[in-house]
Structures are given as C-alpha cells and as structure tokens.
C-alpha cells in the first residue's frame, strides 16, 4: 500500500493529462482511418481538433497546480509550461483547419497527415515541460522527426522531397551537436540528468566555471538556435519553407518555434545559471544577427513563403530581446508576443493557402489586384501582415511595444534601437504586398488574378479554411485592443514559476557590483 502510493506520488500522472488526451486522439485518428478508410476523412480532422481543444481545457484546469512535478522529476507542469503547451496545441488545431482542403487537393492521406502532426504536437508539448536531459532529447527528436516527415509529405512534389532532405540532413547534424552538449552537461555534473541537480553539481565545482561548461553551452545554444531559426543557424529555413506544404510551414513557424523558446528558457535558466552572463551575451549577438539579416534579406524576396521565412527569422530576433532582458517583463513579453504571433502568422499562412489553392502560385507579383476579385482575402492578409509589421492598433504592435519596453527597462538600449529600426524595415516589405493587392487599375492585375476562379465554398475542406481565416483575423484585430488580459496571463505564468523567479533574483544580484562601480 505504502509502496504503491509512493510510486503514484512520484509519477503524478495527472501532470501529463493534456498530453494523454492528445495521445488518445492520435490513437483514435489511426484506428478510425484503419476501420473506416477514406470515408473517415469527413470527421477525423474535427475529432483531432476537439481532442486538442480538450487538451487546452485540461491545461487550463492545471493552472496553479500545487504539485506540478511528475514522472520522477522528469516533467514540470508549471504555469510557464502550461502557456507554451497551450500555444502549441492551439497552433496545431488552427493548422488542421487550414490543411484539410490543401491535403485533399493533393490526393494524399489526410488521416496520416493529421497523425504525424499530432505526434509533432506531442513532442513539442513534452519539450515545453521537460525537466530532465533524457526527456528533453526524446521530446526534441519526436518533434524533429515528425517535422521531417511532414516536410516531405507531398511525395509527388520534388520541391517537398528536396526540402525534406535538406531539413533532415541539417536537423540531424543539429541534433548531434545538441546531444554532444547535453552529454558534456551529464559528465560535468557527475552523472546527473535532472536540470536542477545538474545546476547544483556544476555550481559546486570550480564555482560553476570551466572550459567544459563553456563548450557545452556553445553546443546546446547551437541546437536551440537551429530550432528557433536564429542566425547563423537559419540556412535551412528559406528553402524548407518554400518547398514544404504550406500548412506544415505554418506549424513550423509557430509550434516548433514556441517549443524551441520554451526549451531555451528552461534549459539555460536552470542548467546554465552559473554562466548567465555568457549565454545572455551569446543571445544578444544572435538577436542582432537575426533582426538585421532576417528583415533585410526579406526585402529582396519574390516568393511569399520565402519572405515569411526570413520574416520569422527576424521575429525570432525580436523575441530574443525578452530572453536577453532576463526580467519579469522580459519573459512576460516573450510569452505575450508568441501568443499574438500565433494568430497573425497562422492567419497569413491561411490566406496564402487559399490563394495558392485558387491560383497554384505563391509569387508576390501574382497578388497584384487581388482586392478586385477577393476583398475578404485581401483584408485578412493585409491585417495579418500589418500586424506582423507592428502597425497599431493591431496585436503585433502591442507585442513589440512590450518587448522593446522590457529591453529598455533592462538597459538594452542598443538592442531596442536596432529592434525599432529593423521593425521599420519589416513594415516596408509587408506594406509592399498590401499595396500590390489593392491596385485600382484593371491593367495592373496579375495574370493569376485576372484568371482568378470563383471560390466554391461547398468543396470539402473549404469551410474549415474560411473559419480558420476568420478566426485568426478576429484574433489578430482584437488581441491588440484587448491585450491586457493576454498580458496578464503571460505575466502570471512568469511570476508564478519558481525557476524564473530564482533566475531573475540571481540576475539582479550579479548586476549589483557593476552598478556600485
């Protein structure tokens, strides 16, 4: 009796109830496809979406849990992980809405596509709360391998095959580098795998500073930077985004990136607490490079997907300002920006999917004159792009304001000024697309728009795509005006997470001698 109760308390399986719901949904999708075959495609996507929404409800009910540690200290269901897991689950639900018609039109299996995406979601959600090295690596590989499969899912498209091969080769190298850094951590901590135990052992040895720890830090940051598409580990992003199925790109740009930032916060703040100044310096450099290169190179792109690929690199640079700040406001602004980024970026990709389904192209020049043929699509895409650029009063404006203000309070003046300048640069290439869509002269319309077919909303999967566009449009428009509840949620997730509060206190203590001088 005592033994069983001890095991139950150590496992604390309730901490992964949201992931358990996703697992049940995944099994249900596979079994439903096996039993009912192609006839199941009319209801399997909605079953998956309901399962993901149920998972989000379970996450809501787990808020402020008195016992967040589970699975023998390998998983932490604190409020920070709850928010990141909700972002990933919600991004998957919206992506499935967007992908039904896209996958149907390519003639591939919708059930298998959803199953792979749910597996990636599962890996991302576990990664957000992983509190132990083995758990981190298994979750990371579950997310990565599923992403490789989704990237090459359209087997008949040579561009998809090329994107999958590039992603696999570069991703495998990145995983190997990350694993080597993790193995160094394991050795430096005398065989510990729990992050808090690693931090304690490393801090006790040589004051937490050694060449081995520096090498481990470099290798781990390289692996994380690949996942969040930070320069100079971004080379895969434009080619993979351009060649992959558009719904997959939408998921990678939001869900995978959110998981990467969750990993960065938990791993760096806990295991590398003794070298906080060093990793803050490295991420300052990564933020500068990402903001500059991402937004400048995006100016020269002719493909919408490549433009948004470089845009996502720049957006990662903005988010890193909050990470470098290392304060309550910094971490809160990171979470808030990722919340609003979910809606505006997925909304932009939903519009690109609809346009490509009608015209078969994603060239920016082919959007010329779209307003005359499809005003709703033009409005939705314009609002999402302007929000990404940070135009008030849309959600992206408040997201950037919170990030820049957090950076300014942390005395990161140069980083904030650079962020403002590159944000202005980004507005140019977003507005260029908007201006092209609203040209008034009929002779200025592109050939694709001139031959724009009538939208048949009665086709399978078209209504869900329309719902996805409308939902993201409303969320992007209202999230800016009603930003206070979202920011309160983000702030609560940070202030109630013990590991972040300890890190913030340590950061303040380390700054005292410098200030006194």
UniProtKB/Swiss-Prot annotation:
One of its GO terms (molecular function) is quinone binding. The lineage of its organism: Bacteria, Bacillati, Cyanobacteriota, Cyanophyceae, Oscillatoriophycideae. It catalyses: a plastoquinone + NADH + (n+1) H(+)(in) = a plastoquinol + NAD(+) + n H(+)(out); a plastoquinone + NADPH + (n+1) H(+)(in) = a plastoquinol + NADP(+) + n H(+)(out). It is an enzyme of class 7 (translocase). Keywords: Membrane, NAD, NADP, Plastoquinone, Quinone, Thylakoid, Translocase, Transmembrane, Transmembrane helix, Transport. It is found in: Cellular thylakoid membrane. This is NAD(P)H-quinone oxidoreductase subunit 2. PANTHER family: NADH DEHYDROGENASE. The gene is ndhB. It comes from Rippkaea orientalis (strain PCC 8801 / RF-1) (Cyanothece sp. (strain PCC 8801)). Pfam families: Ndh2_N, Proton_antipo_M. The chain crosses the membrane at residues 16-36, 43-63, 80-100, 110-130, 133-153, 168-188, 211-231, 245-265, 279-299, 307-327, 335-355, 379-399, 401-421, 467-487.
């Amino acid at each position: 009796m005592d033994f069983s109760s001890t095991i139950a308390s150590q496992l604390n399986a309730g901490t992964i109830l949201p992931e358990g719901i996703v697992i049940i949904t995944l099994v249900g999708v596979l079994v439903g496809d096996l039993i009912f075959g192609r006839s199941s495609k009319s209801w399997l996507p909605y079953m998956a979406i309901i399962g993901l929404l149920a998972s989000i409800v379970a996450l809501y009910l787990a808020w402020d849990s008195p016992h967040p540690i589970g699975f023998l200290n390998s998983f932490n269901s604190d409020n920070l992980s709850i928010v990141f897991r909700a972002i990933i689950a919600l991004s998957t639900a919206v992506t499935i809405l967007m992908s039904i018609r896209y996958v149907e039109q390519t003639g591939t299996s919708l059930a298998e596509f959803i199953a792979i995406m749910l597996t990636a979601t599962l890996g991302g959600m576990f990664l957000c709360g992983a509190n132990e090295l083995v758990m981190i690596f298994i979750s990371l590989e579950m997310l990565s391998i599923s992403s490789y499969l989704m990237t090459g899912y359209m087997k008949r498209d040579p561009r998809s095959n090329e994107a999958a091969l590039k992603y696999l080769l570069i991703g495998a190298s990145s995983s190997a580098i990350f694993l080597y850094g993790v193995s160094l951590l394991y050795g430096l901590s005398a065989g510990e795998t729990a992050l808090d135990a690693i931090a304690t052992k490393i801090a006790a040895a040589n004051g937490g500073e050694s060449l081995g720890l520096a090498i481990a830090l470099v290798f781990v940051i390289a692996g994380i930077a690949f996942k969040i598409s930070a320069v100079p580990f971004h080379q895969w992003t434009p080619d993979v985004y351009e060649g992959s199925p558009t719904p997959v790109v939408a998921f990678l740009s939001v869900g995978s990136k959110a998981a990467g930032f969750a990993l960065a916060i938990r791993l760096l703040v806990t295991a590398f607490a003794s070298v906080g100044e060093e990793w803050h310096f490295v991420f300052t450099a990564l933020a500068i490079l990402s903001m500059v290169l991402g937004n400048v190179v995006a100016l020269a792109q002719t493909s919408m997907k490549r433009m948004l690929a470089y845009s996502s690199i720049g957006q990662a640079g903005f988010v890193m300002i909050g990470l470098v700040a290392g304060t309550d406001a910094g971490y809160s602004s990171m979470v808030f920006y990722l919340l609003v980024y979910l809606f505006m970026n997925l909304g932009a990709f939903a519009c690109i999917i609809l346009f490509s389904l009608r015209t078969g192209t994603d060239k920016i020049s082919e959007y010329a004159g779209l307003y005359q043929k499809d005003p709703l699509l033009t409005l939705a895409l314009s609002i999402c792009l302007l929000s990404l650029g940070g135009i008030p009063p849309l959600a992206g404006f408040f997201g950037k304001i919170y990030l820049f203000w957090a950076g300014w309070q942390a005395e990161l003046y140069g980083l904030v000024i650079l962020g403002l300048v590159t944000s202005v640069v980004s507005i140019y290439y977003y507005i260029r697309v908007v201006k092209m869509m609203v040209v008034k002269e009929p002779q200025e319309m592109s050939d694709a728009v001139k031959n724009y077919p009538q939208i048949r909303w009665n086709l399978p999967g078209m209504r869900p795509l329309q719902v996805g566009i409308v939902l993201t449009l409303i969320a992007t428009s209202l999230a800016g005006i009603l930003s206070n509840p979202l920011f309160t949620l983000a702030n609560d997730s940070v202030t109630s997470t013990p590991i972040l509060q300890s890190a913030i206190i340590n950061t303040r203590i380390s700054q005292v001698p410098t200030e006194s001088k």
